[in-house]
Swiss-Prot record:
It comes from Lactiplantibacillus plantarum (strain ATCC BAA-793 / NCIMB 8826 / WCFS1) (Lactobacillus plantarum). One of its GO terms (molecular function) is protein-macromolecule adaptor activity. Enables the recognition and targeting of unfolded and aggregated proteins to the ClpC protease or to other proteins involved in proteolysis. The N-terminal domain probably binds unfolded/aggregated proteins; the C-terminal domain interacts with ClpC. Gene3D superfamilies: 3.30.70.1950. The gene is mecA. This is Adapter protein MecA. Belongs to the MecA family. Residues 119-140 are annotated as: Disordered.
Amino acid sequence: MEMERINEDTIRVVIGNDDLNERGIRVLDLLGNHKQIESFFYSILEEVDVDHQFQDNDAVTFQVLPNRNGLELFISKNSDNLQDTIAKATQSPDQSDDSDSQDDVSDYLKRKLMQTDTNQVEDGQGIAHNPTKDTNDLDPYLDDPDTPTKEYVLKFDQFEDLVSLAQLFRPEGLASNLFKYRDQYYLELVFFVDQSSTATIKDDVAVALEYAHLANISADVLLEHGEKIMSNAALETIRHYFK
């Protein structure tokens, strides 16, 4: 774990996957457990804030930027300029300012990790709209409960298999939901049948099954007894952060 003082109001903490494993935490686990998030954040703050300049401040805020190697945690006692500070600290010299798709997914993860106030509607089962522009054209289908769909639930032996699938699996007319149940990850694929042919759906599922198994459990059971970590655009979100 590395700590850098960005300015008098902000600390950046780089936490690698090894550090997370030692604490028994994975990035995606944080998305579904608000109490675990808060406990984790304050444990990091206690370690790095040896002068107690932040711990004694009621206005302290946190923001997380997950990546494949772990995550960056920004701790600030002045949230007004936090976004600008993070942008300057993380933007490479050749990085374009045109990062709409990154902002879309970052906002999604920020809402899930920080439970910030937004006008977005949360239903207790995940966010109500897509986090990336990749799925914006599916909004009419997602909003219509009568839309004909075909669903498959996949179970992964390890999270890395899910990451590998997300990198190459880009079907048209698909929504994807990620669940965690009994320490296993499950992915629900929801195909909109008027967006894909039966043959195409069959081929897409065959590709997915190279990385996973068909699960003998329904999405309804996962929703009731497990955790829904990502809604509608799980594949896009994983693809973005685990490159």
